[in-house]
Amino acid sequence: MEAKAKLRYVRLSPRKTRLVVDMVRGKKVQEALNILRFSPQKAASIVYQLVGSAVANAEQKGVADVDRLFIESISVDQGPVLKRFMPRAQGRATRIRKPTSHITVVLNEK
């Protein structure tokens, strides 16, 4: 049985988040949670919570055995970019880009 979890508009760069997501794609849930728990990246803690949410969704759906769950697919898509300006010397300004991401996790039983 399939279980999904989505997180949208999270203030993380999609490029940096994909590095974390690539470490856990296709792994068993417990193994993925251990990898994410001990990763120093900011994205790791957010993906950890999202995988935990997907496991809770699977339990709510009535999956027989949570230990058999694995990450079938996990993807990071680009969200809207927040644009800000920072004042600089001599009346100039530079643009600051604050990227956002949409993360989707799909779990399935082996």
From Swiss-Prot:
PROSITE patterns per UniProt: RIBOSOMAL_L22
GO terms, molecular function: rRNA binding; structural constituent of ribosome
Family: Belongs to the universal ribosomal protein uL22 family.
Listed name of the protein: Large ribosomal subunit protein uL22
Record-linked InterPro entries: Ribosomal_uL22, Ribosomal_uL22_bac/chlpt-type, Ribosomal_uL22_bac/org-type, Ribosomal_uL22_CS, Ribosomal_uL22_sf
Family annotation (HAMAP family): Ribosomal_uL22_B (MF_01331_B)
GO cellular component, one term: cytosolic large ribosomal subunit
Organism lineage string: Bacteria, Pseudomonadati, Thermodesulfobacteriota, Desulfuromonadia, Desulfuromonadales
Function: This protein binds specifically to 23S rRNA; its binding is stimulated by other ribosomal proteins, e.g. L4, L17, and L20. It is important during the early stages of 50S assembly. It makes multiple contacts with different domains of the 23S rRNA in the assembled 50S subunit and ribosome. The globular domain of the protein is located near the polypeptide exit tunnel on the outside of the subunit, while an extended beta-hairpin is found that lines the wall of the exit tunnel in the center of the 70S ribosome.
Keyword Cytoplasm: no
Protein species of origin: Syntrophotalea carbinolica (strain DSM 2380 / NBRC 103641 / GraBd1) (Pelobacter carbinolicus)
UniProt KW keywords: Ribonucleoprotein, Ribosomal protein, RNA-binding, rRNA-binding
GO biological process: translation
Gene symbol of the encoding locus: rplV
Subunit structure comment from the entry: Part of the 50S ribosomal subunit.
The organism's place on the tree of life at top rank: Bacteria
